[in-house]
Amino acid sequence: MNIISTRMAVQGVVGASFHDPAVLVGWMGCVQAQDFAMAKWGVGLRLGAGSSRGGGVTDAAVDAAFNSGAILRTHVLRPTWHFVLPADIGWMLRLSAPRIRGFCVPYHRQLGIDAAVLRKSRKVMLAALQDGGFLTRVEIASLLKRAKLDTGDIRMNFLMMDAELEGLVCSGPRRGKQFTYALLASRVAASLGGSASLDLSGDAALGELARRYFLSRGPATVNDFAWWGGMTLGQAKRGLEVVKGELTAAVFDGVEYWFGTDVNAARPGSGVAASLPAALLLPAYDELTVGYTDRSAILPPAFEKASFSGLKPAVVVNGRIVGIWRRVVVKGKVVVELTLFEKVSKTAMAAIEKEARRYGRFLAEGVEVRVTTGRHY
């Protein structure tokens, strides 16, 4: 078994069988999304985006799923934003909020944010949003200031994160390029209609998170799961214990990995053998990198620093990160700029350029995507 090609298969990067952003996010459990534009591409490349044969999701389609509330965005698992389903946001918050709050404690102390401040902040937000409306961060900050709450420095970041962790607010639809917030209860009710959200806690929640993780990201280790889930190793082991009967274990280089019993059948609709694409342009914070604490299956040690531990947008050739990329707009045209860490063959460069064109079709901006190379090796 090739670890990285199998991960690509179960994540839908190879032989994409998903067609709906919400179905993909549900399969993955959560998708890291602090860089919104990059996170949308991460969803898109798993939905056949930009296929030269036509079809596949576009950037606008992922936007539409987000704006409709089919997928939500909040701080969950770790102290950063993730895409998550309305049906899952409640139990995932209950599971992960206590540890994220622990991360916030020293910052609250430094910024003078105490329990009274948090209670008042939540009360203001609840009153402002209780009619089912949507407000931008700037609009909420204005209301907090009117209530004599200091939003300066980075205080506003932590006041909003607290409201998210409390299960009070989550993402609303974008207003132009601005993000809005809504009451989580209203957003979930509108999205689910009469359907019930999952009601999980304790080991049942740990087990469900483990199930989502290992089926959609295996082969992976229990340490990988602990990292991704923002939990202790003990919690990760408890979650794995709940679902290990549904998984298979194998040892590679002395390390135990867990994955779906049939890695090709584990992904809905999949019958595609795991294989490596010639090239990929992975977004920043992609789940093929950020989903694991050990990234050596895709990231050569020599490139760890230059790629920011694989978290920068990555150029991947035959399953290995060989460079980074960025999107810039020059005279109204999208340009994909490459920085390669090693020489690549003409065949590989052609595959990279093909991926850049695919990205352009995903954006659907009707502009030419050019590839410039700034080699640093």
Question: For the regions a protein language model found, what residue spans apply to each?
Answer:
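Phosphate-backbone binding and catalysis cores of DNA-processing enzymes
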Residues: 1-138, 142-152, 302, 335
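Short, cationic-aromatic polyanion-contact patches
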Residues: 83-89, 175-194, 257-269
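Positively charged, polyanion-binding regions of nucleic-acid-associated proteins
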Residues: 116-133, 202-218, 240
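Glycine-rich, small/acidic residue-mixed loop/short-helix segments
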Residues: 301, 306-377
